[in-house]
Amino acid sequence: MKAVIFAYHDMGCQGVQAVLDAGYEIAAIFTHADNPAENTFFGSVSRLAAGLGIPVYAPDNVNHPIWVDRIAELAPDIIFSFYYRNLLSEEILHLAPAGAFNLHGSLLPAYRGRAPLNWVLVNGESETGVTLHRMVKRADAGEIVASQRVAIAQDDVALTLHHKLCQAARQLLNSILPTMKCGDIPSVPQRESDATYYGRRRPEDGLIDWHKPVSTVHNLVRAVAAPWPGAFSYNGSQKFTIWSSRICPDAQGVLPGSVISVSPLRVACADGALEIITGQAGDGITVQGSQLAQTLGLVAGARLNRPPATSGKRRIRVLILGVNGFIGNHLTERLLNEENYEVYGMDIGSNAISRFLLHPRFHFVEGDISIHSEWIEYHVKKCDVVLPLVAIATPIEYTRNPLRVFELDFEENLRIIRYCVKYRKRVVFPSTSEVYGMCTDASFDEDKSNLIVGPVNKPRWIYSVSKQLLDRVIWAYGEKEGLRFTLFRPFNWMGPRLDSLNAARIGSSRAITQLILNLVEGTPIKLIDGGQQKRCFTDIRDGIEALFRIIVNEGDRCDGKIINIGNPDNEASIQELATLLLDSFDKHPLRCHFPPFAGFQVVESRSYYGKGYQDVAHRKPSIDNARRCLGWEPSIAMRDTVEETLDFFLRSVDVAERAS
């Protein structure tokens, strides 16, 4: 059986040798050129291949049509990937009749993605393993062929676990490859509900937070110990790296980051003390803990710190277009609560963000994105993360002004996306739950659910398809030109400053604002088509916390992902929302200032929205991606959200207006 192999690192060497030992013919090996900036402590696949007389290549882009054609000419029966760092295109995966198979360093479906070796140690796992699985378009998601478990000892560090995994991989391959060569290839589907995803790790991820539990800090030290970059902290402006440590008994009443003793060198964490066994000051040599304390000038009672402001690390610059909107102003507040963010914003008004205008890390320009293109391009280039939040997003406008919806929601935002591509900036783009349209799934899955819309003569769908098309364009830019992106899909976020009662007066507001206006003015609450449409209402605080975590993007887990942000537990019909709102209104201390309740009125959607409208019976999100990528769960009950939203709007009504 003829094989083409994609391989790198020690695992790549083990895989190549195992394939040869199993009697396969290797037509060619594809690998990577070593990066001079990387500590190449591992074996060289290219040297191994050259020594064996096997053709070896290291193309910059193996998925280029030229290389796809060359691989096709090799006519492989089977393809193997052993720690090759790039995803293979579907064109390559389909070239081998027997299939393409990848060796992954975890027990799938757990720890899909990058650096599973390090992540299992960071998370304090007691077991991991290696898995050979069939390759499909989604990384690490194909059917499992075979796996082998590896116990993680308490004294294991990254390098010792790496050696264990290499040994386990060789045993696994020696066992399964002869069977596969005979055409017997087991296939067990992965359980998606058990899948977890992790992104790549960077050297800066080794920064120690002494306010974490001591086991967490110790596990970080284990996970990135040499030859990885190491866990580090600061004494003043002096950086030092901890190469080995142990957990000590509780350090009661000691502030985290405080030096408890210098011989041995022990530092307080949230619930105990970390003893530093070996470490290194700056670029110096590795020494034992007490000598490190002497080198750093530490004494008992000294406080270790995070990197000083003068260390040269600048704040993350976030550009928010539509900063005065509902999401924009709440997100600005969340970002400014963190010291390491600076916010640049543009909008056509500033009423919702007036509380930030004098903030030293908030920079606002009043303007229109369709006019001020030069300002926008300059600030896309200047900033690190871009959020184009400007959109017409109220249903009545879809039928009133479909062309304006398309021009703003698609054309203007496409220009911004192209700036992000041009300057290689990360974009966090607001898709919408509307893209699912009339999907019939019980809950809408970002990666599986079909996006179903109505006929062309229903302009109500112009918003949905504009957003969906932009989602697809962004995805294509990510695939073809390396755009870093995350698409997030809000599901009926509610809260203070959602919009305004004036917007509701002209019919251009969200549902709850329109209902509140009816209560304030003593007009009947209109239930469109009886108000039986179900939605999952999400508190703005829950939504913004998820969005903030997307911006933080720990471990790059959100790159290239679509993430629903909604609360499946808060599902209610519009009629149920109106009833809950009325109950809260009757109990509110300002109730006496407003007219009597005028009752409910059932109206047809055609008479309210126009002939181009078409409604959706339900809209419920799957939030598995949010759980995996963000570690996020919504927690705020719908009643709490309704009461807070109502209170905000009632207190915004002028006293004179109440009396009238």
Curated annotation (Swiss-Prot):
Transmembrane segments: none
Pfam families according to UniProt: Epimerase (PF01370), Formyl_trans_C (PF02911), Formyl_trans_N (PF00551)
Catalytic activity: UDP-alpha-D-glucuronate + NAD(+) = UDP-beta-L-threo-pentopyranos-4-ulose + CO2 + NADH; UDP-4-amino-4-deoxy-beta-L-arabinose + (6R)-10-formyltetrahydrofolate = UDP-4-deoxy-4-formamido-beta-L-arabinose + (6S)-5,6,7,8-tetrahydrofolate + H(+)
Site entry: Transition state stabilizer: N102
Coiled-coil boundaries: none
Binding site for UDP-alpha-D-glucuronate: 393, 398, 432-433, 460, 492, 526-535, 613
Gene Ontology molecular functions: carboxy-lyase activity; UDP-4-amino-4-deoxy-L-arabinose formyltransferase activity; UDP-glucuronate dehydrogenase activity
Residues involved in (6R)-10-formyltetrahydrofolate binding: R114, V136, K137, R138, A139, D140
Lipid metabolism is among the record's keywords: yes
Biological pathway: Nucleotide-sugar biosynthesis; UDP-4-deoxy-4-formamido-beta-L-arabinose biosynthesis; UDP-4-deoxy-4-formamido-beta-L-arabinose from UDP-alpha-D-glucuronate: step 1/3; Nucleotide-sugar biosynthesis; UDP-4-deoxy-4-formamido-beta-L-arabinose biosynthesis; UDP-4-deoxy-4-formamido-beta-L-arabinose from UDP-alpha-D-glucuronate: step 3/3; Bacterial outer membrane biogenesis; lipopolysaccharide biosynthesis
Physiological role: Bifunctional enzyme that catalyzes the oxidative decarboxylation of UDP-glucuronic acid (UDP-GlcUA) to UDP-4-keto-arabinose (UDP-Ara4O) and the addition of a formyl group to UDP-4-amino-4-deoxy-L-arabinose (UDP-L-Ara4N) to form UDP-L-4-formamido-arabinose (UDP-L-Ara4FN). The modified arabinose is attached to lipid A and is required for resistance to polymyxin and cationic antimicrobial peptides.
HAMAP family named among the record's database cross-references: ArnA (MF_01166)
Name assigned to this protein: Bifunctional polymyxin resistance protein ArnA
